[in-house]
């Protein structure tokens, strides 16, 4: 039987419906305003935390599940290295009444590096824009205006003539200014080597939890890039501080604490620059009369071309007895009197990144995906084996003997004995182990000091 409607109820519905619609609309508008305000407030929240609040790091999880009910904010860091440009999009969350946590990182890399566009600046904008699109895809629209956007260039641009480097940076700045993110006048810069090392040290100690508690043991950082190499650690021995040469110590203020770090960057001792020096070439200059560069560190049967910093070199190996010894002798000449050795370094736990990892993984010294630990002597053993079998078992890379020998002797110059254990990792808790995370801390802290409002 069909139910007969109650007309009194119908009259009430006619009144209640528009009233409910208005109330619902009011609540929706209020929510949108609050949501946008929370995005702007995120800038102040993270800046304040970077200056004085202890940060914590939690296990990686999906952005949605990790941030429900928390304040959410983001930071974007471009790493313009010598061999490629990389974007890091960091997501942070602050639970009510607690300190912020890192909840997600998006990472993407493009090759070649910015320095490859030194004579065609307009082309550099294409890759930057492509990476910016990655940030837009992973950051909600409402947070764009409150998200700091920064690019820091490293050794690749430091090695370029000043005018060329500045033109590239200006083009990137133009692209950044046209983006919807939070962009300051200092959003694009060339990072000095010490800052690079310190920022990487912050990253690894943050991710390992060493920065959470005052007095806890920290770890050291070794990074081997294409154009430069860095070593950074926190000395515990007063003699280390007193014996350090000028420019090897830097003070870092973070989390209401002051860290006096031993940190130095050796420009020209990155793996690619070292290759050129070992071959007898000069940075940025073609060989005279297109002369072939011959080295005992290359396979005796190898003859080919190698491009570095936009210059192509003709290179070849040489037939000789005792190739490892000859190669090691040449590498030692390149490193002679260029690296400061500190006694304390051998007693500090170190993480090693970048080409240290890549070479170790390539020759089976660590798991290519998970990383792992090895002793410094493993590089020497691998170098001797590869160099002594160059003629009978040529490796897939013509530079294998050279690179392994260089890394082995570089670590020796730093003062590490053969039985010193190093930890090699690309990621810690799924976060890229680069200087990018540490650098974004520094940048946000500087914004707070300048009292820059979120847009």
From Swiss-Prot:
Q: Which residues lie on this side of the membrane: Lumenal?
A: 33-455
Name the EC number(s): 3.6.1.6
Q: Which GO terms describe its cellular component?
A: cell surface; extracellular region; extracellular space; Golgi apparatus; Golgi membrane; plasma membrane
The way this protein sits in the membrane is described as: Single-pass type II membrane protein
Please verify whether the record's keywords include Zinc-finger: no
Q: Into which EC class is this enzyme placed?
A: hydrolase
Give the catalysed reaction(s), semicolon-separated.
Answer: a ribonucleoside 5'-diphosphate + H2O = a ribonucleoside 5'-phosphate + phosphate + H(+); IDP + H2O = IMP + phosphate + H(+); GDP + H2O = GMP + phosphate + H(+); UDP + H2O = UMP + phosphate + H(+)
* Entry keywords, A to Z: Calcium, Cell membrane, Disulfide bond, Glycoprotein, Golgi apparatus, Hydrolase, Magnesium, Membrane, Secreted, Signal-anchor, Transmembrane, Transmembrane helix
Residue ranges in the Cytoplasmic topological domain are 1-12
Xref: InterPro entries: GDA1_CD39_NTPase
Cofactor note as given: Strongly and equally activated by either Ca(2+) or Mg(2+).
Q: Which PANTHER family match?
A: ADENOSINE/GUANOSINE DIPHOSPHATASE, ECTONUCLEOSIDE TRIPHOSPHATE DIPHOSPHOHYDROLASE 6
What the protein does?
Catalyzes the hydrolysis of nucleoside triphosphates and diphosphates in a calcium- or magnesium-dependent manner. Has a strong preference for nucleoside diphosphates, preferentially hydrolyzes GDP, IDP, and UDP, with slower hydrolysis of CDP, ITP, GTP, CTP, ADP, and UTP and virtually no hydrolysis of ATP. The membrane bound form might support glycosylation reactions in the Golgi apparatus and, when released from cells, might catalyze the hydrolysis of extracellular nucleotides.
**Name of protein:** Ectonucleoside triphosphate diphosphohydrolase 6
UniProt organism field: Rattus norvegicus
């Amino acid at each position: 039987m069909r139910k007969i409607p109650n007309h009194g109820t119908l009259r009430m519905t006619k009144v209640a419906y528009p009233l409910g619609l208005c109330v619902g609309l009011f609540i929706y508008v209020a929510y949108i305003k609050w949501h946008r305000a929370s995005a702007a407030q995120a800038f102040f929240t993270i800046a304040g935390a970077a200056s004085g609040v202890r940060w914590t790091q939690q296990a990686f999880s999906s952005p949605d599940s990790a941030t429900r009910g928390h304040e959410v904010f983001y930071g974007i860091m471009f790493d313009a290295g010598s061999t490629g440009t990389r974007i890091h999009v960091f997501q942070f969350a602050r639970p009510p009444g607690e300190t912020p946590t890192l909840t997600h990182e998006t990472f993407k890399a493009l090759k070649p590096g910015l320095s490859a566009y030194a004579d065609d600046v307009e082309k550099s904008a294409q890759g930057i824009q492509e990476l910016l699109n990655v940030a837009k895809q992973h950051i909600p629209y409402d947070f764009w205006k409150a998200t700091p956007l920064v690019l820091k260039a490293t050794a690749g641009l430091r090695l370029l003539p000043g005018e060329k480097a500045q033109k590239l940076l200006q083009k990137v700045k133009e692209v950044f200014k046209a983006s919807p993110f939070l962009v300051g006048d200092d959003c694009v810069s060339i990072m000095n080597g010490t800052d690079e090392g310190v920022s990487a040290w912050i990253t690894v100690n943050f991710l390992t939890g060493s920065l959470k508690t005052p007095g806890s043991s920290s770890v050291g950082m070794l990074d081997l890039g294409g154009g430069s190499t860095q070593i950074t650690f926190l000395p515990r021995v007063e003699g280390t501080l007193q014996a350090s040469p000028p420019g090897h110590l830097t003070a870092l203020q973070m989390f209401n604490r002051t860290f006096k770090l031993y940190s130095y960057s050796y420009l020209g001792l990155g793996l690619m620059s070292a290759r050129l020096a070992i071959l007898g070439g000069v940075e940025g200059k073609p060989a005279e009369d297109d002369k072939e560069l011959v080295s005992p560190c290359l396979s005796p049967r190898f003859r080919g071309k190698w491009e570095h910093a936009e210059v192509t070199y003709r290179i070849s190996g040489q037939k000789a007895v005792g190739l490892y010894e000859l190669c090691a002798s040449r590498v030692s000449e390149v490193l002679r009197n260029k690296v400061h050795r500190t006694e304390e370094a051998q007693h500090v736990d170190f993480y090693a990144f970048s080409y240290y990892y890549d070479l170790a993984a390539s020759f089976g010294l660590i798991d290519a995906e998970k990383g792992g630990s090895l002793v410094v002597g493993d590089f020497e053993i691998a170098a001797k084996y590869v160099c002594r079998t160059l003629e009978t078992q040529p490796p897939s890379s013509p530079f294998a003997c050279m690179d392994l020998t260089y890394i082995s002797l570089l670590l020796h110059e730093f003062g590490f004995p053969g039985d010193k254990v190093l930890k090699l990792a690309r990621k810690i808790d799924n976060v890229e182990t680069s200087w990018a995370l540490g650098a974004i801390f520094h940048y946000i802290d500087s914004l707070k000091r300048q009292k820059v409002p979120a847009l």
